[in-house]
């Protein structure tokens, strides 16, 4: 578990020993979740910070017509989710988090971030400073998403998300499947699939079972 957390932005600049001490001091808990199991539900009280150890998590919101919208896809070990509600003092979550695959999650009590312990541990202060840096990065991410969904056409939205989150070359430009991508862009999946096929026919993208590839990023930029 410690090896997975070393790359987490929450524990940046900390040694393995520092992380172990931090987890003991905070009374953090590691919990396993099965695929599709709820990690927290909409309406639950946000009392603990959640960190992905391994697996993948979808943070979602359901519209009034029952359509699911993915707020965030958590796939990288050490990544946080639900922290905004934990530190805003909200009485309940407005979203829900669900394990996309069998996953292990670290839960750290919220109170640990509001005061330093009697030992005045350096790693405790470092953890709080890292949390502030994470909030700044999250604000930047949300700004990127707003720019993507604000694009005038579906083709522009697709081009924008591929350019923002992917790279041209041998690897897939994006790890989302079509359903997740449609949820992220807030569009119907059939509409997304049709546009992707048209873009593939024009040589703008290559759609395979492995993911969506970008042969030429410059061609995509001309769409914007």
Q: Which residue ranges define each predicted feature?
A:
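Glycine- and acidic-residue-biased ligand/ion/polar-headgroup-sensing regions
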Residues: 36, 47-60, 77-79
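Long, low-complexity, charged/polar intrinsically disordered regions in eukaryotic proteins
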Residues: 127-145
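Short alpha-helix-to-loop micro-motif enriched in aromatics/charged/Gly
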Residues: 65-71
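Short phosphate-coordinating micro-motif centered on Lys-Gly-acidic
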Residues: 38-44
